[in-house]
Amino acid sequence: MSHFSRCFDECSKIERPNVNKKLTRLIIVLFCLLCIIVTLGVIGYKFLFKMSYVDAIYNTAITTSTLGIAPGDKTDAEKIFTGIYAVLVGVFFISVISAIVSYMFTTYILD
């Protein structure tokens, strides 16, 4: 048996139970944060601007997905809320992407 084969066999036996637990925990936390952000958007549109739930969900989906389609005329307050909400959603998604990439890089590439 060559040196390479023995080394490969030993390396393949290494288990990483903590990696899977950490990744699962990270995904659960990020999913919960996403649910909170979407819920805050729906609540904001529903109660601040007296929209129906369908319109509130629609506006939240448009803002969250960064489509930016502006349905109808909006008041200044709606524009301000949508702008602030869009910035928060953007920061959230950038944070999520950087956290996942950083975690995967340090876990799988540096080890």
Swiss-Prot record:
The protein's organism comes out as: Acanthamoeba polyphaga mimivirus (APMV)
Q: Does the keyword Glycosyltransferase apply?
A: no
GO CC terms of this entry: membrane
List the protein's name: Uncharacterized protein R694
Q: Where are the transmembrane segments?
A: 27-47, 80-100
Bilayer disposition of the protein:
Multi-pass membrane protein
Keywords linked to the UniProt accession:
Membrane, Transmembrane, Transmembrane helix
Report if keyword Transmembrane is assigned: yes
